[in-house]
Amino acid sequence: MRSSLAPGIWYRAFILLITFLIYTCYHMSRKPISVVKSRLHHNCSEVIQPVNSTHSLNDTTWCNWAPFDKSNYKELLGAVDNAFLVAYAIGMFISGIFGERLPLRYYLTAGMLLSGLFTSLFGLGYFWNIHVLWYFVLVQIFNGLVQTTGWPAVVSCVGNWFGKGKRGLIMGIWNSHTSVGNILGSLLAGVWVDQQWGLSFVVPGVITAIMGIITFFFLIEYPEDVDCSPPQHHGNPEESQDQPEDPANGPSCNKESSLESAVTCSKEASAQPSAISFFGALRIPGVVEFSLCLLFAKLVSYTFLYWLPLYISNVVHFTAKEAGDLSTLFDVGGIIGGILAGLVSDYINGRATTCCVMLILAAPMMFLYNHVGQRGIGISIVMLLICGALVNGPYALITTAVSADLGTHKSLKGNAKALSTVTAIIDGTGSIGAALGPLLAGLISPTGWNNVFYMLIAADVLACLLLCRLVYKEILAWKSSLSKDRGYREM
């Protein structure tokens, strides 16, 4: 006889897997532009011209892709990045509202199909021999808008199945999809970047569209859809100690998890709460602080995402493929940092404190990487891993466990409809920083890469300062808890 625990375990594992793959594809389709940048404009003096070439032997830009063959190529590439990121930031605030009101399966399917289409269209510019800036900018704008369908929807779906207990660790592991997607995007782009860079976009685009079709057929939005009841929402800790759960009560899929519920997903119309308003979500304690913190944290993370391969190529003089491959170590560090941040924050019950400590440590590590990280391949590998962990750890924690915590805050009194909106507000605010970072890097880098790193260090410090009030509250909570423990021991 099959264990009664099996259905719930398998369904939860399946939801984690499919949402992991979904968002891996979203991030995979964003990454190729950072690898292809160094191919769109590079020094052509070492490239042998074709026999029938009409270019001068002194022309060092003949092999570049117009319109990125001019001296202002960094500004143009920054504009292409920003077209995506500004559209993403604007669309994210709207996406959460739609995510609360539309079936997640349809919403994600449409988003992935369109994301695959626009990612491929960027690469098709190579095969169609397109050399006008507006084409690439327009494709990036539409891609940025449709990519916003991903994050609020997958977080909301996972929140329907998992509760607060051990959420930091579970979502820290699950959130590695961001780094895995970046790594896959870099490696796939690197295969074709030196021969036919258009395929660096077309292949990830096709994979993303295929995953969208898989999502349509296999995504399970709610436990009730497979006859499982969701866990109870925000139980009283004291009551749960005095009155342990009766194993004879409730459906089998409630018994296997030690997690508390994130949301209560009743299908009965009378039990369905109304979706929370935008300003109602802003009033949830902690939403504003974490949103502004993520603005600066994501500024740093996305600057690395879009400019690290070009930085490595310029400073170390690697080829586009070598720079793209080496930059994946930053994302490997991000996987480690996300898991570590979730584990530590669960253990100490302090999300803000964990983020603040990692942000403070990231500042001197970035300074060291810029000054000593390029002195040898071994040092570069170690520094990239450390910087990736410290930069992406807080970013991962805020966009997953913190968003889910705030989206199911006790002040909502069980309203499950807040999760997607809160997630969209936090990630949308962060996406403003994601747009600013690459733009500022494009404007500052002509004055020297040192100045870019000073900008990133300043952003990290500001991100930490914005959490000071929440860190103080967590410290007070720890002191209160220690005082109670001492009182019990004395009794």
Curated annotation (Swiss-Prot):
Gene Ontology process terms (BP): glucose-6-phosphate transport; phosphate ion transmembrane transport
Protein name, UniProt field: Glucose-6-phosphate exchanger SLC37A2
Cell compartments where the protein resides: Endoplasmic reticulum membrane
Protein family according to the UniProt entry: Belongs to the major facilitator superfamily. Organophosphate:Pi antiporter (OPA) (TC 2.A.1.4) family.
Transmembrane annotation, as ranges: 5-25, 78-98, 108-130, 132-154, 169-189, 200-220, 292-312, 328-348, 352-372, 377-397, 424-444, 452-472
Pfam families: MFS_1
Keywords, comma-separated and alphabetical: Antiport, Endoplasmic reticulum, Glycoprotein, Membrane, Sugar transport, Transmembrane, Transmembrane helix, Transport
Annotated gene: SLC37A2
Cited function: Inorganic phosphate and glucose-6-phosphate antiporter. May transport cytoplasmic glucose-6-phosphate into the lumen of the endoplasmic reticulum and translocate inorganic phosphate into the opposite direction. Independent of a lumenal glucose-6-phosphatase. May not play a role in homeostatic regulation of blood glucose levels.
Keyword Transmembrane helix in record: yes
Start and end residues of each stretch annotated as Disordered: 229-257
GO cellular component, one term: endoplasmic reticulum membrane
Primary location group: endoplasmic reticulum
High-level lineage: Eukaryota, Metazoa, Chordata, Craniata, Vertebrata
CDD domains: MFS_SLC37A1_2 (cd17344)
Reactions performed catalytically: D-glucose 6-phosphate(in) + phosphate(out) = D-glucose 6-phosphate(out) + phosphate(in)
Topology with respect to the bilayer: Multi-pass membrane protein
UniProt superkingdom: Eukaryota
Glycosites: 43, 52, 58
